[in-house]
Amino acid sequence: LLSRRQRQMCIRDRDTYRTQIQLLSMLDPEVASDIVVSHQLFAEQSGGSFPRWVMANIETGVMQGDPTPILIANAYAFGARNYDPKPIFKIMRKGAEEPGSKSQDVETRPGLKQYLDKGYYNASIQLEYTSADFAIGQFALHAVGDEFASWRYFHFARSWKNLYNPDTGWLQSRNPDGSWKSLGEDFRESTYKNYFWMVPYDIAGLVEIIGGKEKA
């Protein structure tokens, strides 16, 4: 896959999926495509699922969420397309729907079974998962041409609404039985106020659920 191309590793996916991969994909789509294929190869050689933070060819498990599908979907959207999207989409789906999927010894999505079965989990992790699911849906639709799969992942992405507590007006973690955890619990490297806006694909839905523009 990388004959006469460069393997790109030591990519901090969670720190680069928001802006860096988009810029790189516009400026040098071949290098960005190599990054995508390098992630594919790493997954295929390391348990079948994508990593999220690789250092010296080791999946460290640092940070949370499932950032690689977001990175890849953004690379595709911004012009890095020199690869076959179908096997990449297959890897995305494995991590998103098969509890226990791993990259090396690191579980791709901790808490995935509860997330899929109940539609809620720890708040900041779930908000990362829903962003990843929206990205997978976009990749399914535009790169693979699978409209049915895209709507499946868009449905998962909308589960952020299950975190909204109308009594407090904030997004909160929930226990397995559906009860609310303490406001601010389970937010990593941030606060519940910062993470409140972590639905960039559905800002209109967030504004609506809190009561309109005046509330926002």
Show the residue positions of the predicted features.
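Single conserved hydrophobic/aromatic residue that forms the stacking wall/gate
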Residues: 1-7
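Conserved small/polar residues in nucleotide/adenosyl-binding loops
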Residues: 7-13
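Conserved active-site and cofactor/substrate-binding residues in soluble primary-metabolism enzymes
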Residues: 14, 30, 67, 83, ...
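Alpha-helical support elements that line or immediately flank enzyme active sites
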Residues: 15-31, 73-78, 138-144, 197-211
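Glycine-rich phosphate/pyrophosphate-binding loops
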Residues: 27-50
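Short alpha-helical scaffolding segments that buttress acidic/His motifs in well-ordered protein cores
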Residues: 36-39, 92, 157, 203
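Active-site cavity-forming subdomains of large catalytic enzyme subunits
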Residues: 43-160, 166, 189-190
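Catalytic cores of carbohydrate-active enzymes
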Residues: 50-51, 142-216
